[in-house]
Amino acid sequence: MDRVLLKGALAELFDEGAARFDASMAELTTFRIGGPADVLVEPRTADEARVVLAACRRLGVAVRVMGLGSDVLVADEGLRCVVVRIAESLSQVEVDGERMHVEAGASNADVARRACEEGLAGYEFACGIPGTVGGAAVMNAGAYGGEFKDVAESVRCLTPEGELVDVDAERAQWSYRHSMMGEAGFVVLGATLRLAPDDPRAIRERMDDLARRRAEKQPLELPSAGSTFKRPAGFFVGQLGQEAGLRGYRVGGAQVSEKHTGFVVNAGGATAADVRRLIADVQERVRASAGVDLEPEVRMWGFEE
């Protein structure tokens, strides 16, 4: 990457300070792990996102797109690319009757709270899902019987060629932790959610119940990327880990949670190499004990570079 050329190009597009060089990814991921990214850009509008992605295409620069870093493990060596972070600076929410128009950087928790305040039900399931609406759209995030596809009417995206498109539910092809947008490399900029009117007190009670259940069962007190593996059909990852004797298993500072064996946590001082090795060990042990192949839900960046 020609850093001088790239810096000059970005300086023409954004105010000073909008692009950061050698940005710590450990500060921007929920694992609290990872080396620096060559460049970090946080667009404030959908048009800024479009412009920076177009500039990277023109310069032949590799790009990674992230939200709140809740499903990413960044290599200790960092990332030799531009990271476009769609998060707090692109997180507006507008309510129009029973619809919510949400920018991709809005957190699931904030959207669930706003929906509750407006007396709109349907997004309660996401109140404790770490990450953004953009990530939820790409991965069809779900919890406690609800999924993003259940409430999504359409998603606004940028295609890899830079075209702005609205993807309806049929075209999105949502399934378990999958969407056409993720498959095709679309960048999600926002979504329209169709919710249902309800008493805010009833909505709040449901959200509080889900929060209690999550706190009881999940290791929220330690850095992690949430559920480490996708759920294989017919099995529960936590049960598979328990039966394989993995509760508390460690590699360096990375540990299979004592609380829920479906979670890998940073128990203190873990490196990305520790986490990656631990994930591989879990896969090997579960395959040996149950004949089940676990697919990581966490995205691993920088290891192949």
Segments predicted by a language model, with ranges:
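Short polybasic amphipathic segments
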Residues: 91-93, 153-157
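Phosphate/pyrophosphate- and phosphate-bearing ligand-binding catalytic cores of soluble enzymes
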Residues: 20-21, 29-30, 72, 158-305
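A generic local secondary-structure boundary/capping motif
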Residues: 71-72, 112-115, 123-127, 140-147, ...
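Anion-binding (especially nucleotide phosphate/pyrophosphate-binding) glycine-rich loop
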Residues: 2-133, 143
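Conserved active-site and cofactor/substrate-binding residues in soluble primary-metabolism enzymes
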Residues: 1, 5, 26, 44-47, ...
